[in-house]
């Protein structure tokens, strides 16, 4: 599995808000290295038929290699396509290791939650997960751009958390069948929707009115956070600022499509088409 040489090869890891040709050329290598680190960890946590314990063991070994690379030591020979590139980026750009470690923590949490049949009790618990599964990506990118302002970091967190939540609502029908439940359980109880009903709705392609109201409540709460975070586009100059405009508008467009489908996310999964990209581009121009 060769490592990507530029951000143009980034196509899989949905939590990674980075595009292709808009990425500043001098940052493509470190961004690709960070991406490949996250992508490989995601695969360890999610792909194949390994047991939960084997996945956790693999991520523990992966973390050990990260710590070795952060100290200038040789990593194991298991993932040379990851750590040979990442080690260079760590030294050259002084990457904050805690953000990379947070991503691994989130992957481990996903494995344990799925293994134990657990969901998220409250919105606060779900958002805490997002602080490790999504927000580190934005903070790493800001670090590469040399932006450390607290307000900018807060805006970045809002964008990344919003993107993660949008991905959850978009992928409900897929995640539920994989034993992953991201709608907070207290919200489910409030709307009178059980986990068994969610599973049955996906399997039968029939969604109750209460389930629709539940999903609508989640999706309609997300845009405000994204719009607040979008102030970041005015703090980042050049290509990176334009790239971020497309990222923000892409997330908001998915929310538009969720609404257009009457929040029937247990039946449908919205996807962007050519016209959507035209709309995204137009909206990005006017941010």
Regions found by a protein language model. Name each.
Residues 1-163, 169, 173-287:
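Catalytic cores of Mg2+-dependent Asp-rich isoprenoid enzymes
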């Amino acid at each position: 599995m060769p490592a990507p040489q530029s951000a143009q090869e980034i196509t899989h890891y949905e939590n990674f808000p980075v595009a292709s040709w808009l990425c500043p050329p001098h940052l493509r290598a470190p961004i690709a290295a960070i991406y490949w680190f996250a992508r490989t960890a995601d695969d360890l946590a999610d792909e194949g038929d390994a047991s939960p314990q084997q996945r956790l063991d693999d991520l523990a070994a992966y973390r050990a290699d990260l710590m070795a690379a952060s100290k200038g030591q040789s990593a194991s020979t298991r993932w040379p396509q990851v750590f040979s590139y990442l080690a260079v980026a760590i030294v050259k750009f002084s990457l904050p290791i805690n953000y990379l470690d947070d991503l691994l923590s989130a992957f481990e949490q996903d494995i344990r939650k799925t293994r134990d049949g657990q969901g998220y009790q409250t919105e606060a618990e779900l958002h805490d997960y997002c602080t490790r599964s999504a927000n580190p990506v934005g903070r790493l990118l800001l670090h590469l751009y040399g932006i450390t302002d607290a307000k900018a970091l807060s805006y970045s967190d809002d964008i990344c958390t919003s993107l993660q939540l949008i991905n959850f609502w978009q992928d409900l029908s897929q995640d539920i069948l994989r034993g992953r439940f991201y709608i907070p359980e207290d919200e489910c109880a409030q709307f009178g929707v059980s986990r068994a009903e969610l599973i049955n709705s996906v399997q039968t392609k029939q969604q109750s009115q209460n389930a629709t109201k539940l999903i609508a409540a989640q999706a309609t709460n997300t845009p405000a956070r994204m719009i607040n975070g979008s102030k970041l586009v005015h703090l980042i100059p050049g290509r990176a600022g334009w790239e971020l405009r497309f990222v923000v508008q892409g997330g908001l467009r998915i929310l538009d499509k969720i609404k257009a489908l009457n929040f029937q996310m247990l039946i449908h999964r919205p996807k962007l088409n050519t016209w959507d990209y035209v709309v995204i581009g137009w909206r990005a121009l006017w941010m």
